[in-house]
């Protein structure tokens, strides 16, 4: 699929231009984080083969790991059955979480 065909498959309207994106370790299957993408961040992710997200708090694009060096190299991108959520499998360099943990899901509630 080319970029335009990929973008047609995704329903950005439901989330007011944003879609939740689950980041999973390609090798272990561990869920590393959840972030949000808009069309531009998805385009940049596909173009650069590293993850780009939309920061809802800063209202800007950010390239995961650009500052810390903890980059995420894209191995595959999947879409859910409703076309409104992405799953991106990555090769994670260093920790995925800004706290220094491998995954953002390090706190157990139950």
From Swiss-Prot:
Enzyme class, UniProt record, top EC level: hydrolase
One Pfam family recorded for the sequence: PRA-CH
Residues bound to Zn(2+): 81, 97, 104
Gene Ontology molecular-function annotations: magnesium ion binding; phosphoribosyl-AMP cyclohydrolase activity; zinc ion binding
Swiss-Prot/TrEMBL keywords: Amino-acid biosynthesis, Cytoplasm, Histidine biosynthesis, Hydrolase, Magnesium, Metal-binding, Zinc
GO biological process, one term: L-histidine biosynthetic process
EC number: 3.5.4.19
PANTHER family registered for this protein in UniProt: HISTIDINE BIOSYNTHESIS BIFUNCTIONAL PROTEIN, HISTIDINE BIOSYNTHESIS BIFUNCTIONAL PROTEIN HIS7
Record function comment: Catalyzes the hydrolysis of the adenine ring of phosphoribosyl-AMP.
Subunit structure: Homodimer.
Protein name, per record: Phosphoribosyl-AMP cyclohydrolase
Native organism taxonomy: Bacteria, Bacillati, Bacillota, Clostridia, Eubacteriales
């Amino acid at each position: 699929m080319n970029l335009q065909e990929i973008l047609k498959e995704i329903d950005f309207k439901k989330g007011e231009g944003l879609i939740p994106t689950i980041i999973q370790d390609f090798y272990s299957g561990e869920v590393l984080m959840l972030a949000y993408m808009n069309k531009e961040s998805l385009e940049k992710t596909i173009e650069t083969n590293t993850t780009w997200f939309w920061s809802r708090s800063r209202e800007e694009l950010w390239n995961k790991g650009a500052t810390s060096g903890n980059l995420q190299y894209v191995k595959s991108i999947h879409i859910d059955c409703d076309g409104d959520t992405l799953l991106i499998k990555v090769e994670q360099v260093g920790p995925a979480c800004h706290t220094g943990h491998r995954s953002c899901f390090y706190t157990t509630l139950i």
